[in-house]
Amino acid sequence: MKYTRLDYENFLNTELETQKRAYGELVTTKAITLKEQGKVFVGRFIKLQENGMAIFKVRVSDKMPRKNSFWTASYLIGDMGSYRNWADYSWASLRENYQGDFSEALCAWISKSEDSNFCLIGIKNLALGFAQKLEKERPIIAFGPKDPPLKYLMNLIDIVRDKDCERTASILDFSLANESYWHPKQVESTENLSDLLLETLKTKDEISIQGPPGTGKTYRMASLTSKLLAENKSVLVTTLTNQALMELAEKEDLEPFVNAGRVTKTSMTVDEHKRLPHLLQNLENKCNAAEGKLSLASFYVSSGWAKDHDEIPFDYAIMDEAGQALLPMITAMKKLGKKVIWVGDQNQLAPIVETEEKLINDFGWSYIIKGFNTLCDNFQYPEYMLSDTFRLTDRSAKCTGVFYNNSLKSVSKIQEIVSSIELLNKNGGPSFYGMDLKVGEMSPENAISFICNLVHKIISENPKASIAVLSKFRDTVRDIQKAYVLSSSTRDIPDNIRIETVDRVQGLTVDYCIYIIPNASTRFSLEKELFNVATSRSKGCTVIIADKKLLRNDMSEEVRKYLLKAQDDKFVTFNEPPKSEPGGLKVVGKIDLSQFEKKKREIVPDKENIYIIDTNVFVNCPDIISRIGRNYKIVIPAKVLEELDKLKLKPSIDKKNLNIAAKNINTAFVNSFSSMDEGDVNLLPNGFDRNNPDCMILSVALKYKGGNPILLTSDNVLQSRASALGITTISLREFLQERRS
């Protein structure tokens, strides 16, 4: 498959029109109606704090904004400063005819005031000029819906229309590879990444870097950037969010360059200026490439620079948060830097778009949306993966590692969690708490009550602990926020507790995390990239709260593995092979009927008999687990679950059998009839291909050689390999015939 420029235009125009339509429907509504709905609120400016936070007084009778919500702050002139004069004006009409100035705004906190009729609201992210006007005139400000990034999409449309640019054509006009080219070199925390990249860039113009959770990519990008500035290079760093730019600018390696006035930032806000007084403002957001200087710009701004410049302005262009970039924005970097570095994570959240999922699937636009994934899978640039996580404990890294081919290693100083709360695993990482959750209910009262109590318990043990309570859904978050405030003695949620949707916390690090999965629209909560973000925020423990039958839902293989790992104390066996014990008749409250069964050729009486089931067996006999029965241990290789998921995409496969098999496997896991095992390819003899699926399955059997592993497979080649290694095998046909005879 090959995309045409028209494919890109069609997607970008569809997204543009979708955002316009949604925003248009909102802002053409009467402003007073929006205020009644809580989509507009007004506040009188009180003061600007030393840290750049603007304080506003808002009537408690109005609907309060959500904490950490984004708005557009509008200074309406004349009589329109009072909402009582808005009459039938729409929000759009008010802004068009009476707006004196405006700024982006973030509601950082809400608290009570001395006057019981009002509350105080803290606002961040105000533009410097807007904040100066507030201090001078102390007006009433109206806060309305955040403006969508329409200009960003329009910039990208212009970029894909330019067919004469060879550098962008090298990416935009690609053909999908038959298989992924992504085979990154792993870089450990002790290695000097900057020197490695600089050496590579002597002969290459592009590099892709994957930074899994907590691997210190921002720190390492700051180190690289400081070396480039020391060499008098012009450097651009661009990210989706201004917050990510500030986190980079605050790193120690860049401090001397910031203090020397060699770092500028676009769209500077008053609180950013207070945080870094020596960080220079790019007053007009114009491209300002210069030798020995660093320019910090958001995607919104840098996409405009790429559109307007025919000559490449920067020596080096670095994109952080590349996983949040559409493919045309990924491509735009080729117009901005002679040397380009993309840094991101394909396994975390992709860009959020408004276009309907059906349209995306019908036209195959997912490759355009997931730009960094497409780049990594289809282009043979030098590629690296940061493999050591400073955030996650060893147990947590092994769980999150399922999203990274089990390549993630912990170098965290925290490996043991001291707590009297039984649910929190002492080795850190995830715990699963299953409840009876009502189907279709986004805000289950029993789960929310449990969450509030758990947060209170953690805070009572450690008052300074940082906690994130996350959900996919806004309604769930809003109800948890309300319930927490009602259950506590404060009138606000403290700063060390963040109750938020998952899409708002990428990059966040906390001590504890709670992720609630309502028993409604579960496929959205279990979406692989979102689930990975939600469950990798914590330095200590993560608690997943969901319906106790969650594993019966469809989900990716990685998410299923993670959930099984989270419950290892209950029923999942991973790395410990069984110890052989002598057989014999045992009576422990009941008779072991297996002693009186007709002898089966694969069974060894004086050893533990373990059936390892291959993929082809489930395809042809989806009820194989019940046919084996409960008298014998059943192990399902993780690779088998992965292959079953992939088979669903093949039109020639009986989907009914696959669905029955999946349901039976889930039931067996939930009821402890069977367990999953990832195997250990290090047990394979030399000459065996460790990436071969059959060999991965065979490695599971090798882990159980202390007992009598029985490989149930109809694959003749796999049977031969197993027999050569002393593993008992039986085909499905032989197994069924044996039980009929």
List the model feature ranges, each with a label.
Residues 217:
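Conserved lysine of the Walker
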